[in-house]
Amino acid sequence: MKKNSFVKRLFLLLSAFCLCLVFAAPVSAATIIDEWGKVVTPAAPQLKEVKLPAEGTALLLLDFNKQVCNDKSRPRCVSSIPAVSRLLGEARKANILVVYSLTAGSAAPDIAPALAPRPGDPIVTSGPDKFLGTELEKILKDRNIKTVIVTGTAAHGAVICTASGAALRGIKVVIPVDGISAESLYPEQYTVWHLLNAPRVATMTTVTKTDMIQIGTK
């Protein structure tokens, strides 16, 4: 009897111990992959009118070369060219600095004709971050640039990297949403959201449209 009683008590103790381990075990937190379908799309940001002085402002045209901006691989880039061309015209009238970038393996003649650079316009060639391994930072510093209008493709490549790089260097960033593009809508949406919410970048970024930008105002 005593032996059976001891075994019974031991069994109960072991059972209680096991239950404690079960309840004490940390619960694995759900990851973004687990909850992917629960993500709610943020409300669209409000676009703002932007008035910029000619002095201290530059227009960046990123990777409008035919290798990446074409009807087959990125038709949304081609569709953005008329709006960017109009903005470029305003930039030329205001005589502000216009800087171009190219992807590796391309050259100035590959840029969309409507956006063709003029002699003397700076052109840099690099990967997505146009500051990395180029003279872009020096070009902007030499002209005392305080604000850059960033246009180009891809939104989730050259635009987000270069705009963030400018903001983190203390340069204000203006993003005309009709002047950036990607293969589909989501990367463009994500890029806008990121630039308006990322630490240190958000406070330096304004989102607008090309026809809401005035250049040459005090």
Regions found by a protein language model. Give the residues of each.
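A cross-domain feature marking catalytic cores of carbohydrate-active enzymes
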Residues: 64, 100-103, 177
